[in-house]
């Protein structure tokens, strides 16, 4: 399995305990060093240009990375590309208009990413880790739903609001509301 944006392998132990052969890819060398030593099977590279052949992995997984790349749907397409036929692609990402869309600059991101970034710097004396326009971008549920709807290489198995109770899943059908009450969106696909 491939963990796109997996950093130093935060999910490595859970996946290997379940029997998976784990590979991680990350573009941020600083993030890769987060747990100390870079783990085996770790590749430095871009999620938007995965350095693997088509159909290389049974499971391609990404947790909270799409909002950190300038072209999230290019990354999502790359993830589907390297998933083998019958395999699973799992994406989850933080929605910009959700409560934590601005990450550490929340809730000030509701006034714009540039404002939130400047305010954070003024308050803390340094830039936030997630810099608006550089390493943090606006990604919405609407974009994810549109992307999933036009997939010709994979079928959608589930689209759910991560961290929300099951009774709230129907809110994804209400434009506008879904953007604010959904903290994080999960899209699960099976490659055709």
Positions of predicted regions on the chain:
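S-adenosyl-L-methionine-dependent methyltransferase catalytic module, highlighting the catalytic core
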Residues: 70-78, 84, 88-190
């Amino acid at each position: 399995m491939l963990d796109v944006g997996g950093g130093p392998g935060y999910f490595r132990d859970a996946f290997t305990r379940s029997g998976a052969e784990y590979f991680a890819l990350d573009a941020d060398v600083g993030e890769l060093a987060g747990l100390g030593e870079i783990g085996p099977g770790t590749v430095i590279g871009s999620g938007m240009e995965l350095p693997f052949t088509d159909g290389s992995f049974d499971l391609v997984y990404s947790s909270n990375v799409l909002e950190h790349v300038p072209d999230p749907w290019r990354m999502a397409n790359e993830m589907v590309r390297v998933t083998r036929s019958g395999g699973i692609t799992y994406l989850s990402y933080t929605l910009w208009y959700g409560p934590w869309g601005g990450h550490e600059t929340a809730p000030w991101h509701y006034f714009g990413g540039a404002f939130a970034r400047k305010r954070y710097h003024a308050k803390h004396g340094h830039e936030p880790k997630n810099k608006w326009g550089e390493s943090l971008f606006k990604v919405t549920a609407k974009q994810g739903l549109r992307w999933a709807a036009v997939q010709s290489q994979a079928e959608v198995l589930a689209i759910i609001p991560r961290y929300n109770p099951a009774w709230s899943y129907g809110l994804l059908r209400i434009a506008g509301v879904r953007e604010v009450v959904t903290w994080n969106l999960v899209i699960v696909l099976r490659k055709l």
